[in-house]
């Protein structure tokens, strides 16, 4: 079975690969134990009254669009976003990051663009870039790989695990800026198959195609930290690779998305051009919702009033007993992350 078919990554095969790897991880220290679980958005390390969150992620094949357009500055923002948005899902405040760049050759202009992007992302997320590694590996990398790792800190009694999610809770969606940084294997195939020039206007847009595709990933850290001081958040999910399946990583319940956010034009056009159905779209892309928060019904007005002028948001659904994600408007059912 191929890992990629028609531009769509085989999530089941990917899950089997990850599971095979995780099963070998049998050793652990007796102190500084992992108090989270492997498979969450971030890992948690016991530090007494506090826990350190630690996770890593990358920008994926979005870098190939950047290379074709010779525009690399937004990739740094993307890399910061992919990491800090994962860290915040447990209530952890991201504090520091290291980057990893694997390149074919050394180009000072690309380095400046990337560094500028990382700096902008760090300012938005309020973290420090404290180190990194640049590997020149032309035999391995034909393009460029941009990734990083973030640590954060949270008081142990304030860790958000999703355990308190119950039937009747409210699901709030925070709007995305566009594609963010996942699904680009599919995106690139659609762009190629339809012979779309990156420097022409994207269908239905006044922006160039490369500008639409490279729109940087939205960072939600400051908004979530601010609202955490006011409202009890029960669970959070970063909608990245795997689309809305990420919602199931909070707790095994049924998440009914009965009023989804309106997908931006980029998703509508990619769906048409790629001849994809709604199920495929929602298990690949964020479809306009970059981050999901679960709260109690009584807290929804305070939540919305706190953030309504800072990020697009709306109540998109509710929690029921059961399993998976249901999007009745499009007759979509999603079961499990892998």
Curated annotation (Swiss-Prot):
It is found in: Cytoplasm. It comes from the Archaea. It is an enzyme of class 6 (ligase). InterPro entries: PurM-like_C_dom, PurM-like_C_sf, PurM-like_N, PurM-like_N_sf, PurM_cligase. Its main location: cytoplasm. Keywords: ATP-binding, Cytoplasm, Ligase, Nucleotide-binding, Purine biosynthesis. GO terms for biological process: 'de novo' IMP biosynthetic process; adenine biosynthetic process. Pathway: Purine metabolism; IMP biosynthesis via de novo pathway; 5-amino-1-(5-phospho-D-ribosyl)imidazole from N(2)-formyl-N(1)-(5-phospho-D-ribosyl)glycinamide: step 2/2. It catalyses: 2-formamido-N(1)-(5-O-phospho-beta-D-ribosyl)acetamidine + ATP = 5-amino-1-(5-phospho-beta-D-ribosyl)imidazole + ADP + phosphate + H(+). Its EC number is 6.3.3.1. One of its GO terms (molecular function) is ATP binding. It holds the Pfam family AIRS_C. GO terms for cellular component: cytosol. Belongs to the AIR synthase family. This is Phosphoribosylformylglycinamidine cyclo-ligase. It comes from Thermoplasma volcanium (strain ATCC 51530 / DSM 4299 / JCM 9571 / NBRC 15438 / GSS1). The gene is purM.
